[in-house]
């Protein structure tokens, strides 16, 4: 199932959103046909603009059109002349006020539709299809958010009499996993041998609860010595080693603390030692010296 169906339609409402957002009761078919006409008119004559997708949102009296493009300068034109022309054409088509928003695609190498357009453009310029596919894969895999890509070309490849399809894949592309963020793009290349279809699948990681599990691969882990800020060590006092238990400071066993106090007492300055000696001599009992006559008798 996942190998055949369009990845956007397969995951619609689960991990992907609609490209047309509006509600209609009796005018549903008219709005669908109008959306198709809007997208066709924007694609006609704008091949070099690199349009990735067109989102349409309707209200009662206004139509908002968001154009996602890799080259916004081509869509806007000089002093906004091209944008004004597009807006007037769409207002004439819909009969309503059109709000035109032109959004730039930041990473064109990770957009499946733009990759498919790039491969198709090379095929139209008579570049070998294998070379074009491999070049697209290499450029896409350089992007940190791309985990896998698959590119497929079908038609009279190389001018062969019988049409066939070939694909190249690099990385992981789980088409049947609903939580997988799969971007899909399709474009047709017009060659002298006929049309060649180009399909591109790009895997960008997994989505959990509709939100992307962003794996920050661009944030390279800093080397040792340059890591993020850590909590500083608590300031320690002078390290005192206890002879009995081998502990330092005020911690340790009672024997260790007693030995530490003993060693502390033994390590005294000369002034303290002299003072303590005077105190000890003052407190010592006095012994009477023998008299001279007792010495002679002895």
Swiss-Prot record:
InterPro entries: KH_dom (IPR004087), KH_dom-like_a/b (IPR015946), KH_dom_type_2 (IPR004044), KH_sf_prok-type (IPR009019), Ribosomal_S3_C_sf (IPR036419), Ribosomal_uS3_bac-typ (IPR005704), Ribosomal_uS3_C (IPR001351), Ribosomal_uS3_CS (IPR018280). Gene3D superfamilies: 3.30.300.20, Ribosomal protein S3, C-terminal domain. Residues 212-298 are annotated as: Disordered. GO terms for biological process: translation. Pfam families: KH_2, Ribosomal_S3_C. Residues 214-237 have a biased composition (Basic and acidic residues). GO terms for molecular function: mRNA binding; rRNA binding; structural constituent of ribosome. CDD domains: KH-II_30S_S3. GO terms for cellular component: cytosolic small ribosomal subunit. It comes from the Bacteria. Keywords: Ribonucleoprotein, Ribosomal protein, RNA-binding, rRNA-binding. Residues 38-106 form the KH type-2 domain. Residues 265-278 have a biased composition (Polar residues). Binds the lower part of the 30S subunit head. Binds mRNA in the 70S ribosome, positioning it for translation. NCBIfam families: rpsC_bact (TIGR01009). Part of the 30S ribosomal subunit. Forms a tight complex with proteins S10 and S14. PANTHER family: 30S/40S RIBOSOMAL PROTEIN S3, SMALL RIBOSOMAL SUBUNIT PROTEIN US3C. This is Small ribosomal subunit protein uS3. It comes from Saccharopolyspora erythraea (strain ATCC 11635 / DSM 40517 / JCM 4748 / NBRC 13426 / NCIMB 8594 / NRRL 2338). The lineage of its organism: Bacteria, Bacillati, Actinomycetota, Actinomycetes, Pseudonocardiales.
């Amino acid at each position: 199932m996942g190998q055949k169906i369009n990845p956007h339609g397969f995951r619609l409402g689960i991990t992907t959103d609609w490209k047309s957002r509006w509600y209609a009761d009796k005018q549903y078919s008219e709005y669908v046909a109008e959306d198709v006409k809007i997208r066709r008119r924007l694609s006609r004559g704008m091949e070099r603009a690199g349009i990735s997708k067109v989102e349409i949102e309707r209200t009662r009296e206004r139509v908002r059109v968001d154009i996602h493009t890799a080259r916004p300068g081509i869509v806007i034109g000089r002093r906004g002349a091209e944008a004004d022309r597009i807006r007037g054409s769409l207002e004439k088509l819909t009969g309503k006020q059109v709000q035109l928003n032109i959004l730039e695609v930041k990473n064109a190498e990770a957009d499946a539709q733009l990759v498919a357009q790039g491969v198709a453009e090379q095929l139209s310029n008579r570049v070998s299809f294998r070379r074009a596919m491999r070049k697209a894969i290499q450029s896409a895999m350089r992007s940190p958010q791309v985990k896998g890509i698959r590119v497929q070309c079908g038609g009279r490849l190389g001018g062969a009499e019988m049409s066939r399809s070939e694909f190249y894949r690099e990385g992981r592309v789980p088409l049947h996993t609903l939580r997988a963020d799969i971007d899909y793009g399709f474009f047709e290349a017009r060659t002298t041998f006929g049309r060649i279809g180009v399909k591109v699948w790009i895997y960008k990681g997994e989505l959990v609860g509709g939100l992307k599990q962003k794996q920050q691969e661009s944030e390279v882990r800093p080397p040792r010595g340059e890591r993020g800020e850590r909590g500083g060590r608590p300031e320690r006092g002078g390290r005192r080693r206890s002879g009995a238990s081998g502990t330092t400071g005020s911690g340790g066993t009672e024997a260790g603390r007693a030995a530490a106090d003993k060693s502390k007492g033994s390590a005294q300055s000369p002034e303290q030692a002299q003072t303590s000696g005077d105190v000890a001599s003052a407190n010592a009992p006095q012994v009477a010296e023998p008299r001279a006559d007792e010495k002679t008798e002895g």
